[in-house]
């Protein structure tokens, strides 16, 4: 096998949340183990990487590390010298947009020269800059799922006209992603369902989209043995990699509210972090279930596996999953699984989970 010089682009790569940094860590590690030279080019927050993998930091303004206007203004004013992309990033964020993908793509285009890499892997930025890079270097565009699905579910659960206006403004980058996706020569996605949705939502020929399912580290995600600990019969676990409607955490919280009187010892562990003062925290207060819920974040793979293995039931209440890692991880740990019958989840579970009809799921949320 020919050894390649591979560049991996990731516009943001938080190592413990959102999935992007975790994906970059795993794919770069495995490509290096195959003997390839791997360089990750990332915007902030930056990923954790294995030794021997180069990291090129491509900083923007990192405005979304805070939502305080004074802090954002300070970041902008302290940037010296300023480029057009810095001005664009600041003012688009100021009016409620999300400019990071576009500006990261422009910076990557200016950085990468024809002789730098044999191939470039893009981790779902789908930025205009990729079109120029593709003129001299082959690009494999990884699309986990079309972000149009996130927009759809946010709008579905938003009744405020003002809120709906800002949701549409935030997802303004989708027009760019649709245009760029059509022009990418090679697209990779982890499930048949994502292939269909990318084709439908982004107008991409399915023949251009290759399906390679993500793998589960079965050396780490394993059943618990008696020497390591014990299962708690009233302990339920779920994962919410982002505090957004798409992940469906509110359904599980409402279920805990209903079950706590029947099973006073019940406890839900959530792998993830809610937004401070956000919808999830408000819902927990409204349902008066804070004593039954705990959140855990910044966990290693081994720590996550232990949390799964100690639980009696795992729940995946997502409304959409391009590839549901929590589904596969729970099954690998031999934990009984309840999951929504949506998107890629049935592809992963086959008959080995209790699947909940999405219509019943949504009807309960609307009550």
Residue ranges and their predicted role:
Residues 319:
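Aromatic "clamp/platform" in nucleotide-sugar-dependent glycosyltransferases that forms part
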Residues 280-302:
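Nucleotide-activated donor-binding/catalytic signature segment of Leloir-type glycosyltransferases, i.e.
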Residues 70-95, 134-178:
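Acceptor-binding helix/loop patch of EC 2.4 sugar-transfer enzymes
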Residues 336-339:
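Short hydrophobic beta-strand element within catalytic cores of glycosyltransferases
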Residues 228-247, 253-256:
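Conserved donor-binding/catalytic core segment of Leloir-type glycosyltransferases
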Residues 353-362:
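Conserved acidic donor-binding segment of nucleotide-sugar-dependent glycosyltransferases
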């Amino acid at each position: 096998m020919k050894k390649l010089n591979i560049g991996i682009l990731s516009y943001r790569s938080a190592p413990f949340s959102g999935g992007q940094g975790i994906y970059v860590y795993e794919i770069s590690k495995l490509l290096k183990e195959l003997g390839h030279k791997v360089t990750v080019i990332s915007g902030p927050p930056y990923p954790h990487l294995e030794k021997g993998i180069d990291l090129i930091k491509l900083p923007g303004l990192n405005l979304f590390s805070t939502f305080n206007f004074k802090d954002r203004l300070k970041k902008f004013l302290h940037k010296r010298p300023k480029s057009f992309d810095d001005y664009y990033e600041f003012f688009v964020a100021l009016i409620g947009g999300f400019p990071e993908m576009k500006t990261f793509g422009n910076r990557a285009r200016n950085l990468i020269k024809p002789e730098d890499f044999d191939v470039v892997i893009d981790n779902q930025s789908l930025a205009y800059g990729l079109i120029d890079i593709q003129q001299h270097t082959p690009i494999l565009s990884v699309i986990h799922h079309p972000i149009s699905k996130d927009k759809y579910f946010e709008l579905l659960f938003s009744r405020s006209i003002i809120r709906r206006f800002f949701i549409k403004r935030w997802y303004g980058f989708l027009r760019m992603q649709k245009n760029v996706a059509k022009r990418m020569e090679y697209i990779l996605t982890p499930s048949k369902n994502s292939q269909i949705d990318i084709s439908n939502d982004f107008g991409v020929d399915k023949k251009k989209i290759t399906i390679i399912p993500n793998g589960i580290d079965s050396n780490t995600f394993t059943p618990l043995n008696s020497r390591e600990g014990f299962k708690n019969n009233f302990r339920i676990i779920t994962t919410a990699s982002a505090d957004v409607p798409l992940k469906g955490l509110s359904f599980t919280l409402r279920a805990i509210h209903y079950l706590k009187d029947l099973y006073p010892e019940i406890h839900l562990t959530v792998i993830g972090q809610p937004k401070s003062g956000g919808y999830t925290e408000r819902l927990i207060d409204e349902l008066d279930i804070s004593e039954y819920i705990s959140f855990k974040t910044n966990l290693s793979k081994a720590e996550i596996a232990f949390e799964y293995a100690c639980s009696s039931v795992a729940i995946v209440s997502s409304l959409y999953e391009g590839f549901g890692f929590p589904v596969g991880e729970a099954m690998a740990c031999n934990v009984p699984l309840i999951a929504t019958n949506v998107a890629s989840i049935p592809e992963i579970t086959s008959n080995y989970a209790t699947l909940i009809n999405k219509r019943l799921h949504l009807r309960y949320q609307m009550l």
